[in-house]
Amino acid sequence: MGNFHATTIFAIHHNGKCAMAGDGQVTFGNAVVMKHTARKVRKLFQGKVLAGFAGSVADAFTLFEMFEGKLEEYNGNLQRAAVEMAKQWRGDKMLRQLEAMLIVMDETTLLLVSGTGEVIEPDDGILAIGSGGHYALAAGRALKRHASEHLTAKEIAKASLEIAGDICVYTNHNIIVEEL
């Protein structure tokens, strides 16, 4: 059997608020949509942290559990938990095989965490990953730049995913948005 994957996750810090959106599509291989309503964005650490994943579903659940453990270990310090998780992920032969990426955020910090050991904080407070990530990122940057006084973080996140869903065949319009 092949891998279950493909999604789009978008996150933004905007006007003192933060929001993360993800679509619900799970694709089996490159040809079959297996699920339309997957929940790929979650609140962690007593609702103070948002996390979203793109990639293999089973791998992502493993990473969610691992990240949540690091958050507990480091008392909710997002940056420290992300760095320690990335070190463990990169340094462990079995974990290196996991095929997923995470975006994690709290009210002040937004980070991309990958299995290559990268922990990246964007300059503009916007991140997007997954098959429709480039489309969502472009849409989100345009919306923030040209309509920021009229839109909330949640509205920008949702609109960015809707635009990605119009373009990317691996992104659907069953959008879940979480905010802090």
UniProtKB/Swiss-Prot annotation:
Gene Ontology MF annotations: metal ion binding; threonine-type endopeptidase activity
Q: Which organism is it from?
A: Bacillus cytotoxicus (strain DSM 22905 / CIP 110041 / 391-98 / NVH 391-98)
Activity regulation details = Allosterically activated by HslU binding.
**One Gene Ontology term, aspect cellular component:** proteasome core complex
The transmembrane residues are: none
Protein's gene:
hslV
Q: Which residues bind Na(+)?
A: G165, C168, T171
Which cysteines share a disulfide bond?
Answer: none
Catalytic class of the enzyme: hydrolase
Q: What is the lineage of its organism?
A: Bacteria, Bacillati, Bacillota, Bacilli, Bacillales
Q: How does it assemble?
A: A double ring-shaped homohexamer of HslV is capped on each side by a ring-shaped HslU homohexamer. The assembly of the HslU/HslV complex is dependent on binding of ATP.
EC number(s) of the enzyme?
3.4.25.2
Where, per UniProt, does this protein localize?
A: Cytoplasm
Per the Swiss-Prot or TrEMBL record, the active site comprises T7
Put simply, this protein is called: ATP-dependent protease subunit HslV
Q: Which reaction does it catalyse?
A: ATP-dependent cleavage of peptide bonds with broad specificity
Q: Which UniProt keywords apply?
A: Allosteric enzyme, Cytoplasm, Hydrolase, Metal-binding, Protease, Sodium, Threonine protease
Task performed by this protein: Protease subunit of a proteasome-like degradation complex believed to be a general protein degrading machinery.
